[in-house]
């Protein structure tokens, strides 16, 4: 036995040596190599704080998933996966610890078993949950998303940094929901999971296990399919203190339910290009999963009742011990009456079971109707509030718009008044003499017309006189030339001659 124990411990240490969890420093951005598990390499916005620890979970030299861990609550805020299938529910689970969460100065860069961490890690359990925290409690270790780090179907290895306190029944139902949703609804409608991004998280409550590990109020899952032209996004929540089935919600509604109302996927997983027809098909499968869970819960509630009734009937009608003095006639009557008694009991149980099933069916129908009415009232109230808010915004904006119009009218009036004042000022700035000249201009113009006409006539007369003088001068000059020529020739012409030479 001692040799087998040491061999098992050696195998565990060898397995732990393959599993590495890298804690990112505060000055480092994102999740390092694990950014590929987020849509477009962008982690959710609005969830991380300075108190949280970012972990890139690795195994056998490759990254497996990313985790944002809360040391204050000792549970994860969320974990991110891609194309991951949950582990089998029948596989035995074994959790490992991250030493650097409790001891930042630890030189151990690999997750280890709790037994080995007791002697090698300082302040163990001060900031993270341990297996010992769940002993003698009503809760057990439950994985947010049961994604195994190894491929062993009999022994699944999980980091405790991805676990939260869950009751046994809740853990079984949550893992059953995840297996059904992934295998039947999400992976088949997203290129077999190649472009499927998964986020799972927990919202802490005010209750803790042994005052240490925070019990989640509800757990959630968000899925983003990034297939171009055929993408979709969807969310799911499940309350830990409620017997209701898993609920499907729209991505934006899920973000409103989470603390600080974060954005889980960048641009809401390509919201403008999502395929609504695929989402309808997914919701049909989700409804089937929900109906199956309701049926399973109904059977679980009926099983204890049937067992109790069987015990009660056994107590009420025990088999009577034979008496030595009983007559043969009594035995015959008892033999004949027994089938009728059994038949009556059978009819009674059948009627009781039918009535119980009818009541349960009516309860389910009433609950579904109440949920439908509640949903309708919620959407109606939301629409009414939006309508009233829009009307209120318009009513509030009316005085402002009126003030803007009045301001524009006053501004236009002031501009007109300014123009009039400018015209008056310019008119007053003109000299009086100029105004008199402008006023007397028509009089002077009319009075100058005769003078101008006279001057024109005198000018015309002078022009005619000048023309006559020019003509006579020209003729006289010609005669002088002619006389000069004749004189040189020898003829003498006198003006006193009577016409003879």
Curated annotation (Swiss-Prot):
GO terms for molecular function: endonuclease activity; metal ion binding; nucleic acid binding. Its main location: secreted. One of its GO terms (cellular component) is extracellular region. It comes from the Eukaryota. GO terms for biological process: innate immune response. Its EC number is 3.1.30.-. Coiled coil: none annotated. Residues 1-21 form the signal peptide. It is an enzyme of class 3 (hydrolase). Keywords: Acetylation, Endonuclease, Hydrolase, Immunity, Innate immunity, Nuclease, Secreted, Signal. The modification N6-acetyllysine is found at residue 408. It is found in: Secreted. Interacts with RNF26; this interaction is important to modulate innate immune signaling through the cGAS-STING pathway. Belongs to the DNA/RNA non-specific endonuclease family. May act as a DNase and a RNase. Plays a role in the modulation of innate immune signaling through the cGAS-STING pathway by interacting with RNF26. This is Endonuclease domain-containing 1 protein. It comes from Mus musculus. The lineage of its organism: Eukaryota, Metazoa, Chordata, Craniata, Vertebrata.
